[in-house]
């Protein structure tokens, strides 16, 4: 393990050793949340319909999230170039967490669909932001390996999502399908705030 936690690379500052492991872990958590919420609601949908009604709009609980995350991804990439990847990534986490909390508090199917879209807007930033930050903090020769690990998050989330969703519905409430994001997201925020130090662009370009 290198005695020096930092070395110049790319547009940011490459990390090594414990510093890299800590930051990478936080980025993995962010990606995991974004991927998890694509599938975690699937086993909760029958219970949600039984509580909120709105059977005809059921598919939009998933679709609104996916559409919002896909549509917002290019915008986050540009905002990261303009204002720095760290503040934009933090904003994405906060949007995602607000959307998660509001989704759990929903009192109608319409509210849930709208708040899932808000969640998706945050998720788009988590996905693109994590990959962009990795490109900044991981030395170039190791970048492919770390990107591969990030990619495996989606495989894990696709299996864990329905299982965790089913467990939470049975053990507590369908609302905890969304509340479960809060402690994980807060941990990721704290690590990024205090351990990730990136160069913020001095020159800002128009969108």
Predicted features along the sequence, with ranges:
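Transmembrane-helix bundle of Major Facilitator Superfamily
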Residues: 2-200
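Short, intrinsically disordered, charge-balanced linker/junction segments flanking boundaries
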Residues: 203-207
């Amino acid at each position: 393990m290198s005695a020096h936690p930092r070395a110049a690379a790319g547009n940011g500052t490459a990390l090594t050793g414990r510093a890299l492991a800590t930051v990478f872990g936080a980025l993995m958590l962010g990606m995991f949340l974004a991927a998890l919420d694509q599938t975690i609601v699937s086993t909760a949908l029958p219970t949600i319909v039984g509580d909120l009604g709105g059977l005809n709009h059921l598919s939009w609980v998933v679709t609104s999230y996916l559409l919002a995350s896909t549509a917002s991804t290019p915008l986050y990439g540009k905002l990261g170039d303009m204002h720095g990847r760290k503040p934009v990534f933090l904003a994405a986490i906060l949007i995602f967490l607000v959307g998660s909390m509001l989704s759990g508090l929903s009192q109608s199917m319409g509210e849930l669909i709208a708040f899932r879209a808000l969640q998706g807007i945050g998720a788009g930033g988590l996905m693109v932001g994590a990959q962009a930050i990795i490109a900044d903090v991981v030395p170039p020769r190791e970048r492919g390996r770390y990107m591969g690990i990030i990619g495996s998050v989606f495989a894990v989330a696709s299996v864990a999502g329905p299982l965790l969703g089913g467990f939470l519905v049975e053990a507590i409430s369908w609302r905890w399908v969304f509340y479960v994001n809060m402690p994980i997201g807060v941990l990721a925020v704290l690590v990024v705030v205090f351990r990730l130090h990136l160069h913020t662009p001095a020159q800002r370009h128009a969108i």
